[in-house]
């Protein structure tokens, strides 16, 4: 799922120093393959079906909270995915399976463009998040483009917002240079070193292309490397209004 606006944003969630022998060393980070295996179960696909079989739409999502006792899982996705004019049924499909679980809409906002859905009788691991990103950080986007199989795309943080220390190189992530397409809205943006969630895909910029033979017919294509992200900071504020504090990962 992804909104596109030509030429504009297409709308679519500390290292500790150790001193040894007079030298400062950083703790060893886990291998990226291990990090990836840890975050994959938290990435899901969302599907919506219109009543009466009038078509379907797709988006991506990320698990932000769970309750193992009551077997409940809360999933974050893009707000515009659930903003359909006609009633729709929402389903969640987990990574690596064809199983579908019916979901209930809990909350949706336009600013930020986020939605929270609840799935019963399913327990998935929630992600941990980090609100500060750094320019050049390696990131992963785990999405289900065009409603198909899971895709892992890599890139870097290319734009951050103003942080509390006014450091131009760090702050809430705003843009990454990872290329995404329709169906990636709501996908988690993860730090590739730690697996922490630093944001959620909102959309991508598009360009209009017309052919000489049919100038009235315009195609909109994603602009490579201009993916807009809702920061983990904005995700935290959104979740704080959803009464999930007891179920969020510490």
Label for each model-derived stretch:
Residues 29-32, 43, 47-75, 101-102, ...:
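A conserved glycine-rich beta-strand in the N-terminal activation segment of trypsin-fold
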Residues 34-35, 62-66, 104-106, 118-149:
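Active-site substrate-binding loop(s) of clan PA
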Residues 1-11:
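Bacterial N-terminal signal peptides that target proteins for export
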Residues 10-20:
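Bacterial N-terminal signal peptides
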Residues 40-47, 59, 118-126, 151-238:
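Active-site region of chymotrypsin-like
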Residues 46-48, 87-96, 137-144:
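Short conserved beta-strand and strand-loop elements enriched in small hydrophobics
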Residues 66-111, 121, 212-214:
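Catalytic-histidine neighborhood of serine endopeptidases
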């Amino acid at each position: 799922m992804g909104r596109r606006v030509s030429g504009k944003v297409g709308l679519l969630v500390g290292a500790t120093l150790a001193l040894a022998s007079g030298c400062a060393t950083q703790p060893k980070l886990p291998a990226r393959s291990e990090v990836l295996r840890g975050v994959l179960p938290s990435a899901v696909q969302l599907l919506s079906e219109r009543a009466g079989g009038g078509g379907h739409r797709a988006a991506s999502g990320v698990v932000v909270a769970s309750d193992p006792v009551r077997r409940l899982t809360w999933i974050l996705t893009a707000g515009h995915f659930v903003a359909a004019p006609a009633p729709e049924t929402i389903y969640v499909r987990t990574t690596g399976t064809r199983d579908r679980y019916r979901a209930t809409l809990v909350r949706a906002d336009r600013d930020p463009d986020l939605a929270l859905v609840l799935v019963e009788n399913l327990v998935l691991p929630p992600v941990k998040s980090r609100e500060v990103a750094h320019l050049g950080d390696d990131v992963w986007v785990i999405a289900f483009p065009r409603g198909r199989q899971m895709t892992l795309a890599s890139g870097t943080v290319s734009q951050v917002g103003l942080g509390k220390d006014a450091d131009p190189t760090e702050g809430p992530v705003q843009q990454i240079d990872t290329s995404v397409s329709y169906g990636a809205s709501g996908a988690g943006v993860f730090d590739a070193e730690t697996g922490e969630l630093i944001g959620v895909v909102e959309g991508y910029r598009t360009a209009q292309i017309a052919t000489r033979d049919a100038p009235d017919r315009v195609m909109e294509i994603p602009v490579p490397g201009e993916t807009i992200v809702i920061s983990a900071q904005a995700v935290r504020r959104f979740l704080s209004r959803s009464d999930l504090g007891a179920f969020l990962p510490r």
